[in-house]
Amino acid sequence: MNYDKKTIRDIDVSGKKILLRCDFNVPHDKATGVIHDDTRIVSTLPTIRYLLDHNAAVILLSHMGRPHGEWKKELSLFSARDHLEELLEMPVPLTEDVLGPDTKAKCAALQPGQVVLVENLRFRLEEEKNDPEFAKELASLADIFVFDAFGAAHRAHASTEGVSHYLPSVAGLLVEKELEFMGKALDDPKRPLVAILGGSKVSDKIGVINNLLQKADTILIGGGMAYTFQAALGRDIGTSLLDANHVGYAKDMIAKAQEMGVKLLLPQDNLAAKEFSADADPILVDAAAFPHDLMGMDIGPKTIEDFTGAIAGAGTVIWNGPMGVFEFPAFANGTNAVAKAMADQKDAVTIVGGGDSSSAVEKSGFADKLSHISTGVGASLEFLEGLVLPGIACLADKD
């Protein structure tokens, strides 16, 4: 997939109506509408402001949750609208329907320098079905389509891919940044390239591991998925998380890494516990002599030393997935140590690939010291797998 896409900087937007696909699918209190994390809204502000500063009229599109074509008040975009008005310090009208009379009237009346937000697109079933007529109707509202919803880039929906068949289509500034960092890290990285993989299941990361084995110099494996790799070495893992269907795959990957000259580091030691609880006492165990009645909860100090040492020598670091149960303070050391080691690498390109690892970095306090934190979850994973993302592939390539 070509990552060198045209952006809003490459076209004239003055006096034009812009259909801007954002990702305002933010965690919020369904009763009060209070937003818990506004990262996705804040991340697209540079694009909105650029368009307004260049005399464009901006029609914002987004989804929220999974209403399955039903109108659900708790999944309305009113909370995102209210927050946007505060951030932009200007009115942001919210349409009362999706492509009904109110949407069409508000968009028709929109002037350069003004913004309107269309209500949750998933209130219409046609959105997720990528219905061509629905996409065509959306496109009829504007002159240009701008895609800035990286978190939805892996979805071929009417507002992410469908509209591109009817309008000139370019990337927003957030998507430009995602492609610049994630694309270069995979295709032309500053070496050595160190990939850190964590999280629960091996099955969730099969495509990522397969792709990174072709590209990385070193792969560090922690989190719940590491116990499946330990089991592949014939080790006892006690009551730790085991992806039993993928022990054979893990064994093959260990052999393949060796064959390809990729350094694959697994935990030497772990912090374990008798039960999965925030109050459980951490017990340090050797990975090669794991007690049968304990479960692994985090990587241990020797492993932290190994992993941070590998990060210290890196030119590029990509991280996806926590090293342990970071939500429990007693088992957050490994995750925090990785975040700190990345933050300390001033000369390296340091990228966090969305999801739990992004939350962990924010919680660790090192987020502002890293090169890039992806706003995608599923999109970031599919990007790391080397898959084609429909929301990106449909955008115009640079000349």
Regions found by a protein language model. Give the residues of each.
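Active-site loop-to-helix "anion-binding N-cap" substructures in soluble metabolic enzymes
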Residues: 1-399
